[in-house]
Each structure stands twice: as C-alpha cells, then as structure tokens.
C-alpha cells in the first residue's frame, strides 16, 4: 500500500495549493518537493480560487489565521469542491480562540472536506463544535497531556475519531504518539513516530501538506493514501 501510493505520487507529481501559516510555509514547500509533489502557496482572496482551479489538491491550515485568510479559504474550498479536488483541513489550535473556532465551524459547514489532520485536542475541540458544546481547555496549538494518544487511551481515541469521521463524511487523521487514520468504518493505527518530533515546530503542518499530495495522487483510495502519508512522515 505504502509503496504503491508513494509511486503514484512521484509519477503524477501533483500540484498542492497550500493556504498555510507563515511559521512553516518554507518547510512544507521543501517537503512537498522532496516527496515528488509541487508546492504553490497563495493566500490572497483575489487569486486563491484561481490558483486552486489549477491545482490537484488544496491544503488549508489555520495556524496563523487572520480575517483576510477566511474568504480565501472559503473561495478556494468551494472551487476545489466544484472541480472534485481533494481538500484537507489542518485546524491548528482550533480550541485556542473564538476566531479559530468560528472559522473552522464555517469551513465545516460550507465545504466538503476530504480529510482533517489534527492532534487529539484539536479533534476533541471539533467534536465539541459539532455537538454545540462549550469549548474546552486549550494548550495553544499543542495537544493537552491528557489528550495524547497512548496505547492505554487508544480505544477511546479510535472511537472518537471514527465517530467524527462518520459524522463529517471525511477521513480523520488523529496524530500523536500513536497515529490514527479512519474513514469511520476502518481504522489504521501507526506506531512509527519518535518523541523528538514533538520538540520541533511544523511536523504536523508538514504532514498535512504531504497528506494532501498523497490524496491527490491516489484519488480512488483516500484512506490508504492518508495512512501512507502518515507512515512516510513517521
């Protein structure tokens, strides 16, 4: 599965449009180039939809969100939906502010997402949004210690991810010490990460960009593509 999905990516060299944060934009661009994809970053509302129309995947990341980015994300997402282009959302720190919560709620309402890549605290925050519950505690953009996906908590996190995937009709990629990838029916658990990955900024953002590329290159096997991206990243 991994070798096939990666071979498809390198053969097709998909163009990935990322509306992403300025902390990790260069890292994401270089990672896409390294894996065989082609990056383009365009966040101005006047061109975002046009760029998406020429791309093979759309990666939306709210890490450095501002009010100008929201219409760009919505316009690009609508264009992607109209053209059948996969859309991945990385809801960075969604529980940290009302702007982030409101933006993610609007994106979930107005766009058809292919996948959401998030840590456990972000997934829980989205689940609360979908249930119209008050926002819970936040650790900024990091997962709270009690939310980390460990072997001991694996079952409850698989259940959470599967329920959200089924409700939203998209793939949920819940990342942490153990990574969970699910479409609501089947769940894949991946154990090849390393504790040092939590000591740098941008690993999640890079994985989101990489996953968008894998989804673009493997349109008929999205779950396998998402799992392959996580395996590749570690």
Give the label of every model feature segment.
Residues 69-118:
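Glycine/small-residue-rich loop that forms an oxyanion/phosphate-binding "nest" at active or ligand-binding sites
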Residues 54, 75-79, 92-101, 122-129, ...:
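Low-complexity, flexible helical/coil segments
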Residues 1-82, 86, 158-234:
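Small-residue (G/A/S/T)-rich helix-start motifs and N-terminal tracts that mark the onset
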Residues 20, 68, 95-96, 152-153:
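Residues that cap or flank secondary-structure elements
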Residues 99-187:
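Conserved phosphate/ATP/ADP-binding segment of small-molecule kinases
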């Amino acid at each position: 599965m991994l070798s096939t999905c990666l071979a498809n990516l390198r053969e097709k060299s998909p163009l990935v449009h990322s509306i992403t944060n300025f902390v990790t934009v260069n890292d994401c661009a270089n990672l896409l180039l390294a894996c065989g994809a082609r990056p383009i970053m365009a966040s101005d509302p006047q061109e975002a939809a046009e760029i998406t129309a020429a791309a093979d995947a759309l990666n939306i990341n709210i890490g450095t969100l501002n009010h100008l980015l929201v219409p760009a994300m919505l316009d690009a997402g609508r264009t992607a939906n109209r053209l059948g282009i996969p859309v991945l959302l990385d809801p960075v720190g969604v529980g940290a502010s009302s702007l982030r919560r409101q933006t993610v709620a609007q994106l979930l309402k107005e766009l058809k997402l292919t996948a959401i890549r998030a840590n456990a605290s972000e997934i829980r925050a989205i689940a609360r949004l979908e249930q119209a519950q008050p926002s819970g505690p936040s650790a900024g953009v990091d997962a709270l210690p009690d939310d980390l996906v460990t072997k001991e908590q694996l079952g409850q996190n698989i259940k959470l991810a599967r329920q959200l995937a089924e409700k939203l009709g998209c793939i949920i990629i819940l990342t942490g010490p153990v990574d969970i990838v699910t479409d609501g029916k089947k769940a894949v658990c991946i154990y090849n990460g390393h504790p040092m990955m939590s000591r740098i900024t941008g690993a999640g953002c890079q994985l989101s960009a990489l996953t968008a590329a894998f989804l673009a290159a493997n349109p008929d096997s999205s779950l396998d593509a998402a799992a392959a991206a996580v395996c590749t990243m570690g």
